[in-house]
């Protein structure tokens, strides 16, 4: 799976950079707060689409994608970011945070399943 090229809407913008389940507070089934702005930066905003694979099941991911209105190229870049960031977890946390590694392995599986479904 190649990293998709940039396209419309890929101009550098502010992004959170770490929209994972541990950084999202939900109350009453709705997003109440976002935590941990240590990764805040200016760059490819599609990095924040990782939330689709981090916390959503396939059906919810489809709803999210339609609600956000993201184009195909941006969606593919977001998916590539999700894979890249999930894989980067293993060397650092394999021995110390097995639960985090397990959740990132689930992200890798989701990304690969989505990629296979769109082949």
Model-identified regions with their sequence ranges:
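Helix-rich C-terminal or lid/interface subdomains of diverse kinases
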Residues: 39-42, 50-119
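An alpha-helical support segment within catalytic cores of ATP-dependent transferases
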Residues: 1-17, 104, 108, 115-119
């Amino acid at each position: 799976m190649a990293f998709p090229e940039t396209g419309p809407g890929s101009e550098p913008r502010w992004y959170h950079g770490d929209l994972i389940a541990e950084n999202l507070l939900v109350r009453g089934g709705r997003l109440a707060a976002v935590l941990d702005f240590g990764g805040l930066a200016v760059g490819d905003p599609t990095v924040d689409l990782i939330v689709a694979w981090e916390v959503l099941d396939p059906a919810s991911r489809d709803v999210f994608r339609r609600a956000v209105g993201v184009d195909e190229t941006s969606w593919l870049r977001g998916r590539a970011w999700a894979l890249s960031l999930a894989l980067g977890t293993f060397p650092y946390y394999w021995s110390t945070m097995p639960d985090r590694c397990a959740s990132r392995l689930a992200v890798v599986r989701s990304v690969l399943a989505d990629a296979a479904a769109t082949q």
